[in-house]
Amino acid sequence: MDIQTVLSDLKLNGKVIPVVGGDVNQTYRIKTEHRAYFLKIHPNVKKGFFEAEVDGLKELSAFVRVPDTYMLGETSEGAYLLMEWIEPGKGDQRDLAAALANLHQQTAPQFGFRKDNYLGTLVQKNSFEEDWWTFFFKDRLESQISLAEETNRWNVQRQEKYLRFKERVLKSVEPKKITPRLLHGDLWSGNVFFDQQGHPVFVDPAVSYGNREQDIAMSQLFGGFRPEFLDAYQTIFPLEKGWKDRLPIYQLYYLLAHLNMFGESYGSQVDQLLENF
């Protein structure tokens, strides 16, 4: 997708600097005479792709620091989103833990969200449900499995493993009330940073109201968070007994999504988790 077409559409003139680090969008820092912007471009999608991101950022913005969003649109080649450029700085992982704990203190009557959104490039289903495990299996795991079936990344053997996994999960979890809490939804280390004042900044969410253990599970899946982050979170807002044992349940969701986005290179991790839980 041609960036000059997008800049013309935005009526922006400035120095264009590619920004590396993400797997989903083309990203740029646009330095104009008066300020800097962050521009995200994604080919072959409609602007609804970025409308979902803006909606998620607005949901988070009352409770944690997120970038402001200025304009989104689409061309014949794809869609774009113009955002605030926040200069990265250094910060304390304990402050990040406090910000996440504050986010997780926000609750809702039901699990889900008011509309579907995206995890990476994949549609994230968000129907409202009263029961957490009904929501999680249907709108998280099984929606990803359906996508994997469509691309021949799911077979009879994996389905059999999954059904046994599901049975073990439902037998192992205690029938206690789980409170729907506001989740970032894609909490890997690339989606949080610190600004120049040391404040945590949250980006690229896949927002819903769910079990907060899901955010913790993602934070521990691919690394990048120092031990003091989790220690501080536990001090501020302790997790329920047995939370460590349940993390693989939620990590399966993200591994399935990676299987769908990036292919069979994640298949062995999916298989191992299904077999070992």
UniProtKB/Swiss-Prot annotation:
Its EC number is 2.7.1.-. It catalyses: N(6)-(D-ribulosyl)-L-lysine + ATP = N(6)-(3-O-phospho-D-ribulosyl)-L-lysine + ADP + H(+); N-(D-ribulosyl)-cadaverine + ATP = N-(3-O-phospho-D-ribulosyl)-cadaverine + ADP + H(+); N(6)-(D-erythrulosyl)-L-lysine + ATP = N(6)-(3-O-phospho-D-erythrulosyl)-L-lysine + ADP + H(+); N-(D-erythrulosyl)-cadaverine + ATP = N-(3-O-phospho-D-erythrulosyl)-cadaverine + ADP + H(+). ATP binds at residues 84-86. Keywords: ATP-binding, Kinase, Nucleotide-binding, Transferase. Gene3D superfamilies: 3.90.1200.10, Phosphorylase Kinase, domain 1. The active site is at 186 (proton acceptor). GO terms for molecular function: ATP binding; kinase activity; phosphotransferase activity, alcohol group as acceptor; protein-ribulosamine 3-kinase activity. InterPro entries: Fructo-/Ketosamine-3-kinase (IPR016477), Kinase-like_dom_sf (IPR011009). Ketoamine kinase that phosphorylates ketoamines, such as erythruloselysine, erythrulosecadaverine, ribuloselysine and ribulosecadaverine, on the third carbon of the sugar moiety to generate ketoamine 3-phosphate. Has higher activity on free lysine (erythruloselysine and ribuloselysine), than on ribuloselysine and erythruloselysine residues on glycated proteins. This is Probable ketoamine kinase HMPREF0351_12196. It comes from Enterococcus faecium (strain ATCC BAA-472 / TX0016 / DO).
